[in-house]
Amino acid sequence: MKKNILITFLILVSMKAISQENMVTISGGYSFANIEDTDVKGTGWRINGVYEMNPMAGKFAHGIAIGYINLSASETIAQQTVTSTIGSLPVYYAPKVMFGSDKFKIFVKGALGFQYAWLKREALVTIKDTDFGFYGGGGAGLMIFLKENIFINGEYEIAWASNSSYKDGWISTVSGGIGFKF
């Protein structure tokens, strides 16, 4: 009986050693980008959700992220106002390297995936288009743990969004959010 208890204990301890930690982060923030064929910067907002797996609670995490970015800009050309509105739905793999203690971590992350985009230009004539393309970039941020399993997140991300038939460009985001570790 003692032997069985010892074996069970050793198996449970070894399972803990190879276990993984999971994190979910929901964030939102301010986004900005230079819109091609205009002289103004598009500004707007972003919401984002990330599910991350952290093998053996180490410093490397692997995540899947999905978000929505909404940008708009207006300019006057030849006495008419042209309003550009862009929406983007990026879906990407988000590897992360974390440094720090159990209460405070800083991180560097990547982004590699695709995005589905909507473009709308309004003036005397309204033009609408949709497209699909590459989404990739990187960022950095911090995590402050309020409890062992709850943290607040702040980060900056810059990503290249390309499209097959119309506009490409850099999109920057400054965001904050809340996360849960389980």
Where are these regions (language model features)?
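Hydrophobic secondary-structure block in the mid-to-C-terminal portion of proteins
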Residues: 145-182
